[in-house]
Every structure is written in C-alpha cells, then in structure tokens.
Amino acid sequence: MDINHQNQCIPYNCLSNPDAILLDAERLETGNTVADISLGLINFLYSNFVPGGGFIVGLLELIWGFVGPSQWEIFLAQIEQLISQRIEEFARNQAISRLEGLSNNYEIYTETFRAWEKDPSNPALREEMRTQFNVMNSALIAAIPLLRVRNYEVALLSVYVQAANLHLSVLRDVSVYGQRWGFDPATVNSRYSDLTRLIHVYTDHCVDTYNDGLKNLEGSRLSDWVVYNRFRRRLTISVLDIIAFFPNYDIEAYPIQTASQLTREVYLDLPFVNETLSPPASYPTFSAAESAIIRSPHLVDFLNSFTIYTDSLASYAYWGGHLVNSFRTGTTTNLIRSPLYGREGNTERPVTISASPSVPIFRTLSYFTGLNNNNPVAGIEGVEFQNTISRSIYRKSGPIDSFSELPPQDVSVSPAIGYSHRLCHATFLERISGPRIAGTVFSWTHRSASPINEVSPSRITQIPWVKAHTLASGASVIKGPGFTGGDILTRNSMGDLGALRVTFTGRLPQSYYIRFRYASVANRSGTFRYSQPPSYGISFPKTMDAGEALTSRSFAHTTLFTPITFSRAQEEFDLYIQSGVYIDRIEFIPVDATFESEINLERAQKAVNALFTSTNQLGLKTDVTDYHIDQVSNLVECLSDEFCLDEKRELSEKVKHAKRLSDERNLLQDPNFRGINRQPDRGWRGSTDITIQGGDDVFKENYVTLTGTFDECYPTYLYQKIDESKLKAYTRYQLRGYIEDSQDLEIYLIRYNAKHEIVNVPGTGSLWPLSVQSPIGKCGEPNRCAPHLEWNPDLDCSCRDEEKCAHHSHHFSLDIDVGCTDLNEDLGVWVIFKIKTQDGHARLGNLEFLEEKPLVGEALARVKRAEKKWRDKREKLELETNIVYKEAKESVDALFVNSQYDQLQADTNIAMIHAADKRVHSIREAYLPELSVIPGVNAGIFEELEGRIFTAYSLYDARNVIKNGDFNNGLSCWNVKGHVDVEEQNNHRSVLVVPEWEAEVSQEVRVCPGRGYILRVTAYKEGYGEGCVTIHEVDNNTDELKFSNCEKEQVYPGNTVACNDYNKNHGANACSSRNRGYDESYESNSSIPADYAPVYEEEAYTDGQRGNPCEFNRGHTPLPAGYVTAELEYFPETDTVWVEIGETEGTFIVDSVELLLMEE
C-alpha cells in the first residue's frame, strides 16, 4: 500500500489532525483532540456522577486543570474549519483568556473545597468556601456571555458548553452544600432557582446554535453533505451529548447517583469522491445522500451480523452491498433483517461479520478507495472489525481508523475496555451510472446505551423509551429535539406506545418510584401497565402549546403517586397515552423506608403550600378544586407517624383550613350531599333513583350516583338553583367537580340560556384506572394511600368561550356569565345534571359553583348584548303568552257549565277535553325545556289551567258509565273474543283496533232503568264493510251505530245524516263553537312568531330553539282526518245493558266509547 493512496483518504476522516495515521490495533497517541476530551467528559458525567468532592476534583483533573490554551485553540479550530469561518483575533483571545481565568478560579475553588471537606466545621474554611463560590459564580456569569459573541456563536459553541457545564456543576455544589458552608436558606434556594433556570437557558442556546450552524451547511452537492455530516457528528459529541446530561444537575430531581444513556447515532464519513472528474449532475445530490445514508428515526437496535457482498469494476473488487441483522433491546432472539443495501455482488463469496450484546464491534480499520483519476470506484476494498475479544477481516485491513473520530472514552485502559462507541449499522450510497460510488457508511451508538435495560437497586436509572423492543401500532419514533440524547416517541391517536423490557439487577423485591420525562401540548392522562396487575393512572399536565417547537422548557417530569414493588427479575412495561404527548424516558428511583418517608413529606409539603395564594394561607388559588384539597388531605394522612408526626399534624391543620376556605367560596347549598329533596326550596332536588354514597377510594366525601332511564322524557336528574342574591353583576362563574365515571351525562348551566355539555368519562378499570385494586383497610375503610391517578389541577374538562370540552377527563368545569342582577326577578342560575339514555350513568362529587372573575372588555360587551336580546325575547314571550293563555282558558272554560268548574257541559266529550289540554300545553316556558320538572316563567298560569283539565277528566270519568272507554288501560274491563289490539297512535292516544270480522269486544254496563243515555263513539273505518257499535239488553231494545268508509248515502239508525254529511257537520261544525274543531285547534296562530325561543345567542352560548320534544308531546294530539264521532239516544228498560264492538270486513279503529247519563 503506497503512502500517496493513504493520504488521499485520511484528510476526509481525520480533519482535526490530518497527519495522524492509525494502523495498529492499539490506538496511537494523536494528541488531545476535541473528541478525546469530550468523550472523556461524557464518560465522567454519565458513569461517575456522584455528589461530593470526587466530582469537583474529577472535573478539574479532566478538563479545567488539564486543558490549556492550545487545547482550547483546537476546540475553536475544529468548528472554524467545518464552517469556513475564522473567529476574529480579539474575540478568540478574549474567549481563551476567559477560559484560562475560569480554569485558574476553579483550581482555587477545588483546593478550598478539599480543605473544607476535611474540616467542615471550621468557621474560617466555611467562610473561605463561601468566598470562593461567589468568586467562581461571578466569574462564570461574566465569562459565559463572552462565549456567545454575536456572529461567532457557532464557532464558540464547543467552549460555551464547557463553561455552561462548569457553571451548572458549581450551582449544584451550592445547592447541596450551601447551608453547610454558612449560606442562609434563602440564598441557597435562590442559587437553586438559578440552577434550574440556567439548565434551560444553556440547553436551548446550544441546540438553537447547533441547528443554525447545521442549517447554514446545507447545500446541493455531495461534498456539501460530507461537511454537513462531519459537523453533525462532531458537535453531537462535543455539544449535544453534554447538554443531554444537564437535567441531572437538578439536585431535587436527581439527589443520588444517576445512570443515563445516549441513544443517538453518529455516522462516519463516505469514501473520498472527487467531484471534478465528471459534470456535477453525475454525482448524488446533498438530499440524495442524506436520504440514503441517514436512517429515519427508529427504535434502538444493536448489531448482530453483517453479510457483505463483493462486486467489481475492471480489476477493482470492492464492498458492493450488504445485509444487516440486528436486535432490539432485551430481545436477542428476534432478529430484524434489513433490506439489501447496494448490490448482491458475486465476485467473491459473501462474508459474514458477527457481533453480540457481550461482544460488540468497537472499532473499524477501513481501506477506502477514493474516486479519482487512479480509482474508478469510491468505496471500500476491505475492513477490519475489532470486537472486545477478537477481530474479523473483510478482505483486508486499512488505515482509516474509526478511533480518529470516535476515540476511547478512557485511554488509561485497553481500547477493548475503554472504547466509547459500538458499531450498530451500516448504510449505503450507490451510484451505478457515471462515476461508480459504492459508499458504505458505518453508524455508531454510544456504549452507555446498553443492549439490556438494567435497573440499578441503588441509583436512579434513566431508560429512554426509544429502547423499547416493539413499537405499538399508531405510535411513532420522531427525531429528538437535540438535548434528549436520542429520539423520542409519540402517538397521533390514543393508544399504546410500545413494549419496554427491563431487568432488575438487585435483590428482590425492590421498590421504585416511577417517573416519566415528557412534553405535552395539552392536559393529558395515561396508563402505565406491566405484566403484574394493577395498572397505574398517570397525568401529563400541559407543558407547551400545539405547534410549538420542542425546547428544554417543554419537558417536565410526572411521577406515579406511590412506589411500585417489583418481585420478578424481568418485567415488560407499556404506556397508554393520548395524542400530543411526547415521551423521552422512564426513570426508576429506588426507595427505602426513610427515603420514601422523606419523599412523601416533601411531596405533601409542596402540595399543601401549593393550595394557597401566599405563605400566610389567607386565600386559595383559583385553580385548586375541592377534589384536589381532599386528595392533598389523603396525601397528608398517608404520611408516616413514625418519621414525621409533628410535620403531619401541622400540614393537617393547613389542609383543614383550605377545606374551610373552599366551603366558604362555594355557592352551592349542600355540596357534600347530606340529602336530596330534604327541603322544598333549598339544596338539591332530584329524581328518586339517585343514590348518595359515602366516601371510597376515589371520593373522600359523599358522592351521588345517577343511573340510566328507559324513557328520555323521564330522565334521571339532579338540580339546584343558585339564588340571585348570591350572584354579582357582570361576573363569570364556574361550575366544576370530579366525575369518577360517566356515560351520556348532560351538564347544564342555565340563566339567559343553557350552557350544555355531554360528558363521557371512562372510570375505574377503563382507560385510566384510578385504583384498580380498590384495597380496603383493616376496618373495611378504603385505602386512599393506594396508587391512583396523580392529581393535575389543569387536567379538566374546561369548556370556555368557543373551546370544546376535553372529554374523557375526570375533572370538569363549565363557565357561565352573569349580566345585571335583579332580586325581584330572581333569575339565578340553574345547575342541572341529567341522564336520558338507558345505558347512561354517572358518579360525581366535589361539586363547586364559585366566582371566577369580573367580566371586562369583549366578554362584558358580549353578555350585555346577549342579556338585551334575551329581554327582548322575554317581552315577545309575554305577548305570546297573553294570546295563548286567553285561547286556552276559553277552551277550558267551554268544557264546564260554570266558573266553579264542578260540572261539565252535557255535550263535552273526551276529544274536546284532549283538545283543550293540547291548547294548554301550547303555553311556552311553563317548565324549563332542559328539565321539565323545573318551573318556568309561565308555570303559574299553566298549572292553573292544567288543574282544571284534570278536573274535567275526573268529571268525565265519573259520568261515563263505560269503564276504560278510551282504552288507555288497554283491554281492561272489556270482554274479548277473537284477535284485537290496543295501539298507541299519535303519541298519547290509545285506540282499539278490530282487524277481523269474527272478533268482538263487549262490556256489561249497569244502568238506571227508565233514564235516558247518550251513546257516543269516535271511530274510523278502513277498507270495505262496516264497523258496528251495538247497545242492547238481554231480550230486545237494541240500537246500533255503524261506521263505513263510503261515498254513497247511508242511513244510521236513529240518525238520518249520511256518512259524508255527518263527517262534515257533526265532525266539525258540531264542535266549532266550542273548540274550533279538533284539527284546527292545534294550528299555530299567525300572530305569534313560530320560531320563538329565548336565546343567549353569543358564541359561548347555544342559539336556536330551546325545545323539549317531551314537552311538545304533552297533551293529546288531534284526531287524524277520517275519524267520525256518532251518537244515539238510548233508554234502557232494565238495569243492565251490553255494549258490543265488531265489524263486517276490513279494519275498525275505535278511539273512544262513551255512555253518558242525560240530565233530568
């Protein structure tokens, strides 16, 4: 192999040190490159991060006491070369001098810490430690802005991240040791706030600057992509890998040693391609190279084997194509076979290169053939693969060493032990026509991403969910935001994320808190499941807006409420989430009794303090619900008496105070459901099928259960009125509460009109179980310390303005705006819960109705406009009501002989009573259309007339000697021969249907001999033949009414009117003076607006007809066309008569049969 050939290849793989040539299996010394230093730091951070002096000294020895001006120059030069921009001399010298100053200060800081650590109670050393911290902190605050000089942010980025890392480590020191150094708690808390804030500031600056630099390198040519990929690889190692560790500096989130992993992949270089040999169009473009070489986001995989195929061009044999077999984390037996990369050449026998979880390939020595005048192919002639116990060679070894870009992380040991990366895959860029390109590109993962997800018994273990072995349908892996150390997972619809297998390495059983790092565009819920029941509900509070870019501030932690004890060495987990949630990783935090008690106490203290608007507990925060106060109370009650009895008592008093404040601001009467229908004008009113139940594992206090109904006109309901005296003018109020589960639950707030939502909430054992096991205590009480859905104050069903209600949410809220108030009118606000379906049900409690905020601006103008419109329509309703009431009253009065309403007119029949009843029911707003048991503005006059209608029915029933003459009770009191039916037609009207000529219906009736009676029948005949109603005594005295569907004249016994004339005269005119005929009586009056309904028409409220179909169907409908009422006079001679109904052919339909005693 000649030196010239080597030199053509090396510069494209070793740009930071073009003269370095690595030939042997052991790495030759090449100086302290950026990759050397960065990977050493990454190893130190990810493997040896333990609070204390060891970390401080280690950071000094590794970076700040070791790297001098020449090394800082290398940091700057590496990026300068990639972006073709040299930092101006002033900015360069300023940056290096500042870095030197930080090194000097940190050396003094470290020596002072060593001295103090040996004698921590020495006052002088404590004071010196405070001084040196202040000096170090001030120096960093002054230096870091100078490392992001405008226009040179990209070139300075790799030194900026080093300074940022140092600053965060120093702030962590003071958060841990500050009070022992003599700082007051307020100062320590302030520095801790700086720490958490700067984690985001430094992270976002690094990611934004990296992305800017990468975008600026985008081009169109293949050579542009080579530089682009180098920048991506090198700054991933020197910048992004380091900032991925930054969250671990948070002392409260990570108080003990933490095991972290990097799952990102980096790609080495393509073989050299001289783009001047052929026209530019002959070569792959920038985008083609990116698409072919860089794999799309995927679950982490590990190399099992390569199958390499050899191809040739002229006399040159080269790597022509390959297959990759790989496996996912924890599943070595389920191999994943890649598609064929390149071509399946047969110049030589295929070569298989193997790897395994315990024997990875950590180094390659490649022999590149660059595309130039001497070589017709840009490709690989041979590669040596080194694993931790041996080596394998494809054709021959070469000089291009992967260690030049991915050096060992520990040079103090053999490379087989101190390596930093594993080979995980190889992609391929191929060009057949024109210049031949067979570019194999190796991709590598950091060794911290182990093939087995091991959970430590003594450290916090972070496992990225991208290390799942199976991706669920509907879930996707997306490109990480740059600071997570790899890709992340999400879903575009509700469902599982993917199966993650872990192995517990310590003695079992072992308990862990389970925590997730996530981002969410809205308040979401999820379920954490594994092979042992139960499942655990988890909340994902909103951290970002939809459409917003993922930043460091977008990510937060959410923790299961209680620890989980694992007794098996291997478990498989899955996470059920909604769309808009991004999952980075799961974290296992080991606990023991003392640690758990400390965690629980800290959690309870934070939860209690978070209830109030200030430290003096004078007021509750608006978003703190009554349900949440109960849950915080449970949290306090679950504290250990053994470890924190005094703190528990203090917190308990604060929670009780919070509960009293919650009761004071709640405008509902009896919010804890001491009873329903206890007082006529106060508290809750409800249907009889509602039950009140005592507290359980979900509710601490009473809650109500609503069941389904078989008739939507008779729903299950619960309601209460908020009196006008409790309301403030021009104020928004909020109804809220907690729903354990519900189906078809309708919630209303009614003032000017209805705010309405239908809420379906899966409950226990469904999508998000709260406490699947529902364990009980020793006395049968619910165990509220069991795992359940952690409360999230924003996880609600908030229906405000034009927003839609987020269903499937246990917390709900509904707003309503109040305009001016009038105590005389006492409009108030109606609160209604209703179920009108058979499958409907609900369990709800902790209901609140409270003042939210005064109305201003657009909201104020909107409610004023709506209120005016409502009042205008109320005036129209009054005009309508006056007209309808007058007509209804006339119809009712016409039924009776006098104003005492104690006697019916002689010719009043059942149809006339029905007609009058229907006209009474045409009075609008007698009851609320949303719930017809609640009186409306016209309830008084409606009930007045409806009472007289009931009197008319009673008097009618009393004088009609035929029992069940309207068939409302079916065939009761009637004797039946053959087949007949009673059918309900036109809603409330029951009719007798005689379908066969042999059928007969009869009734024996007791009468007074010698007195006169009127037999009146309303009926309809279908088809041919006649329908007959006969009245007779035992021997003789028979009379009959016949009904026929005919056109010719037909004489009825005792009546000379033909059927057409009878229908015309008696069926209409006979009653027109009383009720204007049955059909006409229900027509709309043209003087009344037919589409009237009081409406609050603004966007936040429903507009249109507030109609209740059940209300409209009340009263009896008119007889359809074709029905005839006929009557005859009958004078019985004995005390018993028979009334018989039959027909000769077709179908005979009878609406009513009356036998009325004539007045003397």
From Swiss-Prot:
Q: Which domain of life is it from?
A: Bacteria
Q: Which UniProt keywords apply?
A: Sporulation, Toxin, Virulence
GO terms for MF:
signaling receptor binding; toxin activity
Keyword Metal-binding assigned to the entry: answer is no
Specify whether Signal is a keyword of the entry.
no
Pfam families recorded: Cry1Ac_D5, Cry1Ac_dom-VII, Endotoxin_C, Endotoxin_C2, Endotoxin_M, Endotoxin_N
Q: Which InterPro entries match?
A: Cry1Ac-like_dom-VII, Cry_V, Galactose-bd-like_sf, Pest_crys, Pest_crys_Cry1Aa_dom-IV, Pest_crys_dom-III, Pest_crys_dom_I, Pest_crys_N_sf
For this chain's UniProt record, which GO biological process terms are given?
Answer: sporulation resulting in formation of a cellular spore; symbiont-mediated killing of host cell
Q: What does the UniProt record say this protein does?
A: Promotes colloidosmotic lysis by binding to the midgut epithelial cells of insects.
**What is noted besides the main data?**
Toxic segment of the protein is located in the N-terminus.
Report the sequence similarity comment from the record: Belongs to the delta endotoxin family.
Under the heading PANTHER family, the entry gives:
ENDOTOXIN_N DOMAIN-CONTAINING PROTEIN-RELATED, PESTICIDAL CRYSTAL PROTEIN N-TERMINAL DOMAIN-CONTAINING PROTEIN
Which protein is depicted?
A: Pesticidal crystal protein Cry1Db
Query: What is the scientific name of the source organism?
Result: Bacillus thuringiensis
